[in-house]
Amino acid sequence: DLMQFETLIMKSGVWYYGSYGCYCGSGGQFRPQDASDRCCFVHDCCYGKNGDIVCGGDDPCKKQICECDRVAATCFRDNKVTYDNKYWFFPAKFPPQNCKEESEPC
């Protein structure tokens, strides 16, 4: 859940990453701005490969979604030093021309 995710990354996931760089938050796209933003790119790619899956019980797809979250949380934690406040609310603070370089494919 979100609280466990935030504990692992040692930051508030929604507050710090809900609108960070070009990729974190809703509708992420274009080239990630730094290693923290890249964590969101990798997480989105992981979910994209698995589709919008809602699973329960011992279903293996639930395990894969949890693995996407685990990898992302570890990525955020390991790259916490790259977090740069200039990218916080980046798309909102700056015009979208800052997020226009295409990202590599997943």
From Swiss-Prot:
Tissue expression as described in the entry: Expressed by the venom gland.
Enzymatic class: hydrolase
InterPro entries referenced in this protein's UniProt entry, alphabetically: PLipase_A2, PLipase_A2_Asp_AS, PLipase_A2_dom, PLipase_A2_dom_sf, PLipase_A2_His_AS
EC number of this enzyme: 3.1.1.4
Positions of disulphide bridges: C24-C40, C39-C75, C45-C106, C46-C68, C55-C66
Family to which the UniProt record says this protein belongs: Belongs to the phospholipase A2 family. Group II subfamily. D49 sub-subfamily.
Name this protein carries in UniProt: Acidic phospholipase A2 PhTX-III
Higher taxonomy: Eukaryota, Metazoa, Chordata, Craniata, Vertebrata
